[in-house]
């Protein structure tokens, strides 16, 4: 009986120390390790309990059932394995946090990137139809946050028709659709029209996850062709060996 108690106590303290270590690294509570033995050295963590973070405690996410974690982890890892360790180091991404019902200021969101903390939080229950593409959309925000000089929004905006204007912020707009347009006219999705940075992220996510659509549409849409070339050219400035 004493031995059993000692084992239980040791497991408790190990879990506590592990949780404290993770918190000290990325400042998110209630996380545990899901997988750290990965080919590109990404560390996958999951929410053991709900957590609230942010300067105004305005970011919330909830824990998931194991079967959901296991299912979505396979999808997420397969997509993030497209990035090698060297590229991830350059863009400053190391930790992937898995949870569900992720929101910021009460608005549900697919992911929250934090370039400074090398972290990307992913809502594993977000729209299953677009889930894989959204992963790369959020990765682009990490890239963009670290290389603003390459992804200049004024230069990007000039690629559009002269009469087009983005909104002030992504949440200021009702343009939230992620379905791919049948007629593009410079944009892959409705959400692309919200802000310049979201447009870039949408273009990047299509380049990585849907090469056939990109090739087909850029042959017919000169604006989209320029946007795709802009993204590719500047990604290669970060890593000349990057494979699209």
Descriptions of predicted regions:
Residues 20-70, 98-101, 168-181, 197-199, ...:
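Non-catalytic architectural context of zinc metalloproteases
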Residues 12, 76-87, 143, 208, ...:
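Hydrophobic, Leu/Ile/Phe/Ala-enriched alpha-helical segments that form helix-helix packing faces
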Residues 92-244:
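Active-site-flanking segments in enzyme catalytic domains
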């Amino acid at each position: 009986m004493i031995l059993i108690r000692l084992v239980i106590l040791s497991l408790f303290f190990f879990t506590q120390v592990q949780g404290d270590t993770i918190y000290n690294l990325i400042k998110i509570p209630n996380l545990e390790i899901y997988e750290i033995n990965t080919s590109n050295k990404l560390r996958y963590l999951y929410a053991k309990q709900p957590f609230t973070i942010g300067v105004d405690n305005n970011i919330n996410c909830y824990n998931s059932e194991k079967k959901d974690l296991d299912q979505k982890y396979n999808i997420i890892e397969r997509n993030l394995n497209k990035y090698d360790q060297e590229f991830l180091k350059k863009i400053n991404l190391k930790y992937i946090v898995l949870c569900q019902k992720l929101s910021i200021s009460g608005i549900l969101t697919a992911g929250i990137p934090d370039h400074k903390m090398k972290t990307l939080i992913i809502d594993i229950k977000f729209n299953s139809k677009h889930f894989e593409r959204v992963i790369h959309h959020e990765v682009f925000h990490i890239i963009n946050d670290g290389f603003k000089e390459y992804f200049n929004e004024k230069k990007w905006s000039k690629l559009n028709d002269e009469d087009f204007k983005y909104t002030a912020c992504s949440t200021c707009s009702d343009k939230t659709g992620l379905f791919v347009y049948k007629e593009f006219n410079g944009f892959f999705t409705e959400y692309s029209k919200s802000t310049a940075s979201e447009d870039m992220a949408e273009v990047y996510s299509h380049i990585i996850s849907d090469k056939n659509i990109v090739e087909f549409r850029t042959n017919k849409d000169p604006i989209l062709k320029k946007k795709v070339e802009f993204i590719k050219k500047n990604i290669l400035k970060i890593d000349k060996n990057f494979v699209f």
